[in-house]
């Protein structure tokens, strides 16, 4: 196997010849002598087959938090597709900011919120008065009169006392931010949507379900839990006052999520989400199921890339998750088994859109094609073609490649008086 790298080590290219050991095998895992790590921030290490037009291409990804040995798992071992060329390269990751997570279907009075939803409800008789706190541009008070509440069939069923279920009602009020020019200028001046925190609500039965900022309107969705009276009516507040505070912008290089569910677990490194089964499920041998996960993320500056976990009990395929949509994936079991909420399916990583702009479609293998274009006269124009995108090599994170030592060399080294036990840090070049 021959190995080559870019001069500034933005990628690693490997040519794999056909070996007789491939004969009669469905798949094989190759381990290389080289070790790779990120020079700066943690990255997502991706591998793709360059000559995918001649075969079923493969695409894989795994987190690169520290030094790792280069490893490749091959499934198509037909002799006619070899020699095969494979690229290893890294994409920078966005950090997950779990401090501004919306928790749907929970009381979110003390949670910071941000969200965008396509449809809005309108009420004719509702009146809203908005005032701005003096000397505090980021705080406003919203007072609503003649509130019209509507039954909500999508909220969870709860009971205040056993045998007395509460009914959930919802409403929405619209605030025209054009009436608050200072707020609009100072809070909405950036490209990011503002993040809101609820300081206080006048009625204890009311909570904020979610907020939407679709300029120039700020939509505030409220929820109220109430008991049905003997006359089959509801006791709900007619008026309500909210005190809201806004953050000017989201912290750069971070992403806000609405996926803080039991099956979406934010990892301790705050750079990925592990996806687990929502419920206990039974699989027959060879059975495929499509899973739908409630919860969205909102950040059009990032691509959410789902990567199957290699240790999962089921098989799935890498895919992209679009903003403001529910996450779905198909899983297949190769045997009859029972899975629980403790069984992992895969992980979700967030990649900046300026690095990767093409939507991933697992139904077309041609979209996996990768190619390197090098220009000796103008190195700045060197580019990687991946997922139908042209990505300049200079935009990729720097990698450090280290040559691994054989067991015999390590044994000789341990018996000598040389104190340098670290692997060589010399970079491999063309």
Curated annotation (Swiss-Prot):
Report any Pfam family annotated for this entry. Herpes_U55
Question: What name has this protein been given in UniProt?
Answer: Uncharacterized protein U55B
Could you tell me which species this protein originates from? Human herpesvirus 7 (strain JI)
